[in-house]
């Protein structure tokens, strides 16, 4: 089988077509392409079928696990594919590890080290119990996130553009420093013991619930990474489409009830907006896929992310 690789403008990317056996898969094509163009390793390649000029149809993305024959017309023994360079890639585990490592290391710096001394405050600073519990709560959360990244999460995509590492790290690391600065500040005014206990108690329950939601989501995904959508079921997923986001938002609400800083609530608002946008997209996608037609189950009526509001 001869495979011609062209750019989106129609220009041939390789000087000559690739010669592959008839039994070759898309993954074999990607490896052969990589051997001819060393720069473009498989996770950097996006291969699609050509689209007729003027057509509004979306290009069909080639599945790496499928045979190339499945994309050929009839008995045709040649194929043209369109190549797009996705840019330098990094694994999702690497991305998540670094974005979570920052807050895990930055927050204790403001608690344990004399940061405020260099900002003009005296050496004798009273550390309130809520500040100690907040540090433990914060570190537990991000340590849990890192463990989930390596031992729980299954990713539908193997890699992410390397630029996302800098963007995500800027988001998590800057908010980590912003919140840590105010919660551990020498002039920080603690809330009442009752409010602190309610906040941290509620937050810890949500952290445990969040972990269980991730276990349920893991069990929905094929270990081989084959992808595909399923209706999430069990526990909070019986009433909320994105229960993992729900518990994530509410666990930060618990943290902010206990610590009560503007910085913390700004982070909560931004995170809630981002996750709500993701949840609306996922809810809409699941309802579209599971429409009750052609033998498919109908997606049940559920809250999207924030019962009883949305």
Swiss-Prot record:
GO terms for molecular function: fatty acid elongase activity; very-long-chain enoyl-CoA reductase activity. It comes from the Eukaryota. GO terms for biological process: cuticle development; fatty acid biosynthetic process; sphingolipid metabolic process; trichome branching; trichome papilla formation; wax biosynthetic process. GO terms for cellular component: cytosol; endoplasmic reticulum; endoplasmic reticulum membrane; fatty acid elongase complex. It is found in: Endoplasmic reticulum membrane. Its EC number is 1.3.1.93. The chain crosses the membrane at residues 95-115, 126-143, 164-183, 197-217, 235-255, 261-281. Pfam families: Steroid_dh. It is an enzyme of class 1 (oxidoreductase). It catalyses: a very-long-chain 2,3-saturated fatty acyl-CoA + NADP(+) = a very-long-chain (2E)-enoyl-CoA + NADPH + H(+). Pathway: Lipid metabolism; fatty acid biosynthesis. It is a multi-pass membrane protein. Disruption phenotype: Abnormal organ morphology and stem glossiness. Impaired endocytic membrane traffic and defective cell expansion. Keywords: Endoplasmic reticulum, Fatty acid biosynthesis, Fatty acid metabolism, Lipid biosynthesis, Lipid metabolism, Membrane, NADP, Oxidoreductase, Transmembrane, Transmembrane helix. Expressed in roots, leaves, stems, flowers and siliques. Detected in mature seeds. Part of the fatty acid elongase complex which contains a beta-ketoacyl-CoA synthase (KCS), a beta-ketoacyl-CoA reductase (KCR), a beta-hydroxyacyl-CoA dehydratase (HCD) and an enoyl-CoA reductase (ECR). Belongs to the steroid 5-alpha reductase family. This is Very-long-chain enoyl-CoA reductase. It comes from Arabidopsis thaliana (Mouse-ear cress).
